[in-house]
Amino acid sequence: MANKTIIITGATDGIGLEAAIKIAALGNQVGLVGRNPDKGIKAIERITSLTGNDKLNFFQADLSLISEINKLSEEIKNKYSKVDVLLNNAGGASKNKVITSEGLEQT
């Protein structure tokens, strides 16, 4: 699969970052989504260094907040004419019940 536009959530480390490296190495345009802009910049630098692919963008978003999901979707629509693949990788774990500022329980 090459020359596709692929969005990967949770793409700044772990499985998401490794997937982004492999997908970028195939020549795809990759949108990395994460909460931490510093980790996003480092991820893009690493992917570019390893693959030579510079068709990378970072989108900052906390996917536990609906308002940020809405903002992210607008940013992606404005950046790309189409998205071929959405790889939903973002996740987290907590031992305690966590309620977001929007009143949603994180799972």
Regions found by a protein language model. Name each.
Residues 1-107:
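Rossmann-fold NAD(P)H-dependent dehydrogenase/reductase core
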